[in-house]
């Protein structure tokens, strides 16, 4: 089972949960701006097919608890990025941050980018490029208090 997050417009979380509840194995958990659920690839496809109010269906890559920027760097640097990103690909990071520990979202995004490119550079000798226009990989980072989730 994988963890997913289906984004939707604020205020439509319940509607979105009702739309997908009969197509997924697990009960959806309503959150601000989306729905969390666990499922398999079949659940993912059915959610994409039947959700009318859902916008982005995100698959969780990594999650951890953290209360300082150095630990974010260490956690992301220790992750194996090779299944989704290598030096030949471009990527972008989109960060949403609501935390008393991390005040500057741009700085957090920069440290996340540094950890990822440093790891790939160490493994391959080259780093992937960041591209704002049509990147190969889009990473969504959601930080709430001390919880960091990477999709």
Task: Describe each PLM feature range.
Residues 132-135, 141:
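Active-site neighborhood for divalent-cation/phosphate handling
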Residues 2-133:
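Non-catalytic nucleic-acid substrate-recognition regions in nucleic-acid-modifying enzymes
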Residues 139-150:
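C-terminal edge-of-domain segments
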